């Protein structure tokens, strides 16, 4: 959406260079429906994840701390999703005022960064737990995990500030509607390109490279360990899990990141064609649905890689309350296999534990 502005009576009025871009009847029906599904599934699933980790698993492990914070970040975002559903169903007419516009927009940005940062830290933790279990024991503590999560929330909050500052309610004169949108006073401004590149690089590229590297090193270490033990089926299981984790992250976010970059080019006036603007504005909410639906499934996806999580999750669904006294040992490895390949790899007698165990 390319916008030009003027101010009257304290209300920002803008002109939309491509007023019909992204405005299709099927979008106004399909997207609110998808948002509603994401809201129901996400609230239900992430609430159960919080209950399982906090009340059943007792939040005793590093991985559970990251997973709990991941679910909480998703819940914060999901609470604002009904606003976006109504906004889209009303054909991009924002009825909730400027403050909720800023809060809802910041929540979307916050969830993006918090979730990606937490998944990145989770991959690093899995790498340390599997490949360097003894060396990392002193670093992989509950205190370090909690401090890391606090830092992540602060960083995500800082990354969301532009939404609080620059996202506002505007009145589009040539379409006679009120929207909640980003608007930049000058097309020569470096702000939109800076925000777009930050989202592309800090919100996707760097985290993806770290996640890819971490799980590649994990797979190599486990492959070596299982070759020593001649356990090929086990090695194949690990490879599939790791590939699923990496590809799940990649394909969830790539479409949204691509169209975010194109949207920046439109805002800067690099792209003038309204047909391209229409494609971008039409595709953007669809890519958001893909990215954030998968995002909200992440806690369940990662949690179900662990046998203990699955056990407690099924107990919760059957209304079986948590035991008053927690188990003395608790799996913390997510897709990590309580087996530690760096511990006496040459010992063929040592049998690896479940490859899907979440320590």
Curated annotation (Swiss-Prot):
Family: Belongs to the G-protein coupled receptor 1 family.
Topology versus the membrane: Multi-pass membrane protein
Main subcellular location: membrane
Lineage: Eukaryota, Metazoa, Chordata, Craniata, Vertebrata
Matches recorded under SMART domains: 7TM_GPCR_Srsx
Residues covalently joined to lipid (S-palmitoyl cysteine): 355
Residues annotated for angiotensin II binding in this entry: 15, 17, 167, 182-184, 199
Record-linked SUPFAM superfamilies: Family A G protein-coupled receptor-like (SSF81321)
Subunit structure comment from the entry: Interacts with MAS1. Interacts with ARRB1. Interacts with FLNA (via filamin repeat 21); increases PKA-mediated phosphorylation of FLNA.
Gene: Agtr1a
Record-given protein name: Type-1 angiotensin II receptor A
Residues in the Cytoplasmic compartment per record: 56-61, 126-141, 217-239, 305-359
UniProt keyword Phosphoprotein present: yes
Ranges facing Extracellular side: 1-25, 90-98, 166-190, 269-278
């Amino acid at each position: 959406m390319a916008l030009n502005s003027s101010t009257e009576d304290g209300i920002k009025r803008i002109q939309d260079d491509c007023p019909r871009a992204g405005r299709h009847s099927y979008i106004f029906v399909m997207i609110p429906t998808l948002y509603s599904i994401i809201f129901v599934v996400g609230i239900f699933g992430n609430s159960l994840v919080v209950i399982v980790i906090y009340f059943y698993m007792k939040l005793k492990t590093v991985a559970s701390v990251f997973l709990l914070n991941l679910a909480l970040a998703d819940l914060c975002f999901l609470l604002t999703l009904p606003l976006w559903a109504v906004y889209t169903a009303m054909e991009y007419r924002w009825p909730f005022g400027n403050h909720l516009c800023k809060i809802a927009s910041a929540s979307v940005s916050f969830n993006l960064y918090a979730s990606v940062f937490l998944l990145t830290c989770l991959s690093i933790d899995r790498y340390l737990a599997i490949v360097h279990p003894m060396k990392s024991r002193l670093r992989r503590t509950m205190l370090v995990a909690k401090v890391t999560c606090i830092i992540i929330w602060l960083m995500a909050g800082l990354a969301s500030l532009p939404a609080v500052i620059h996202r506002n309610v505007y009145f589009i004169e040539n379409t006679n509607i009120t929207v909640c949108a980003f608007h930049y006073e000058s097309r020569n401004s470096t702000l939109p390109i800076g925000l777009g590149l930050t989202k592309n690089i800090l919100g996707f590229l760097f985290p993806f490279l770290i996640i890819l590297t971490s799980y590649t090193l994990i797979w190599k270490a486990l492959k070596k360990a299982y070759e020593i033990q001649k356990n090929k089926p086990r090695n194949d299981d690990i490879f599939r899990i790791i590939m699923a984790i990496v590809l799940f992250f990649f394909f969830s976010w790539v479409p949204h990141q691509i169209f975010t970059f194109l949207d920046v080019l439109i805002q800067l006036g690099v792209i003038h064609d309204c047909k391209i603007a229409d494609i971008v504005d039409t595709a953007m909410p669809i890519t958001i649905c893909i990215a954030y639906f998968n995002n909200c499934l992440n806690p369940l996806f990662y949690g179900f890689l662990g046998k203990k999580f699955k056990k407690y999750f099924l107990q919760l669904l059957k209304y079986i309350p948590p035991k008053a006294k927690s188990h003395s040992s608790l799996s913390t490895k997510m897709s990590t296999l309580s087996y530690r390949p760096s511990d006496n790899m040459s010992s063929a007698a040592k049998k690896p534990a479940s490859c899907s165990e979440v320590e």
